[in-house]
């Protein structure tokens, strides 16, 4: 049996993630007390109909129970239940904006909101440290998050590690959820060609421009060589998720092109390869 544990700071999209999995026929429970996790896991093992489940855990648990999470997780794993932990987060500025827009009450509402966000992140630290997959929802809409959850988690019947290539722009910040970050700002920039400026790295004119430069080809080959060497080692350690972020200045041309090229190359080698362009969304 596989059990997904969805956690994260308030406002990061935990409920959306659970609803996305529920739509994929997962059995979902939100805000289950941590001390009930072993009981729930044993019950699910006895019910052959429920082989995929997702549990939402957040700061509404008592602090002492949150601190016991690593021990409880070990108990569940010893019982033969394979757990995947997904932790959602976002920048403080984004979380403050979301609470302002929705006017919802924070679980730690007895203190100022900015302080509550920091305290909650600290309370959930024991869960975040155990996360198999961290998702930064700072620049992600509701619909994009639902799609991302469905693609990375909802299709776990397919074997192998889920590999995501993500392009981004440094001027908008580095993704918080990346395992590898590669800076390609040293490559020729199509932005300085007026006819290419409004296009993206997926357009044929930009692709042709970048393919003409030997430095771009060399960077692409170096990334492939590096990743081919190390991806199998990550997979051999039973790693379920890996995110490779490629960054250029604006996240529109060079990083998009290379993310697409890497996806095309590794798609033939791995069953679960995805590509996301943060700044084009």
Swiss-Prot record:
The keyword S-adenosyl-L-methionine does not apply. HAMAP family: RapZ_like. ATP binds at residues 8-15. InterPro entries: P-loop_NTPase (IPR027417), RapZ-like (IPR005337), RapZ-like_N (IPR053930), RapZ_C (IPR053931). Displays ATPase and GTPase activities. PANTHER family: RNASE ADAPTER PROTEIN RAPZ (PTHR30448:SF0). It comes from the Bacteria. Gene3D superfamilies: P-loop containing nucleotide triphosphate hydrolases. This is Nucleotide-binding protein Noc_2797. SUPFAM superfamilies: P-loop containing nucleoside triphosphate hydrolases (SSF52540). It comes from Nitrosococcus oceani (strain ATCC 19707 / BCRC 17464 / JCM 30415 / NCIMB 11848 / C-107).
């Amino acid at each position: 049996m596989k059990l997904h544990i969805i956690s994260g700071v308030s406002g990061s999209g935990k409920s959306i993630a659970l609803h996305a999995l529920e739509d994929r026929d997962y059995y979902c429970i939100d805000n289950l007390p941590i001390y009930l996790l072993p009981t729930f896991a044993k019950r699910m093992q006895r019910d052959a109909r429920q082989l995929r489940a997702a549990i939402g855990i957040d700061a509404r648990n008592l602090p002492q129970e949150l601190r016991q999470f690593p021990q409880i997780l070990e108990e569940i794993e010893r019982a033969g239940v394979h757990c995947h932990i997904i932790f959602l987060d976002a920048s403080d500025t984004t979380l403050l904006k979301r609470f302002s827009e929705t006017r919802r009450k924070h679980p730690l509402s007895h203190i100022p909101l900015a302080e509550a966000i920091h305290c909650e992140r600290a309370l959930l630290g024991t869960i975040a440290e155990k996360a198999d997959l961290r998702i930064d929802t700072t620049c992600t809409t509701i619909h994009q998050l639902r799609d991302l959850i469905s693609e990375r988690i909802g299709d776990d019947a397919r074997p192998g590690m889920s590999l995501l290539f993500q392009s981004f722009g440094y001027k908008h910040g580095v993704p918080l959820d990346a395992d590898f970050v590669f800076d390609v700002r040293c490559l020729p920039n199509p932005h300085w060609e007026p006819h290419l400026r409004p296009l993206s790295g997926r357009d044929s004119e930009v692709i042709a421009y970048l393919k003409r430069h030997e430095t771009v080809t060399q960077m692409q080959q170096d990334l492939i060589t590096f990743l081919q060497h190390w991806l199998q080692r990550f997979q051999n350690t039973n790693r379920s998720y890996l995110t490779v972020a490629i960054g250029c200045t604006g996240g529109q041309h060079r990083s998009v092109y290379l993310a697409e090229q890497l996806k095309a190359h590794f798609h033939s080698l791995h069953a679960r390869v995805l590509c996301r362009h943060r700044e084009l969304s």
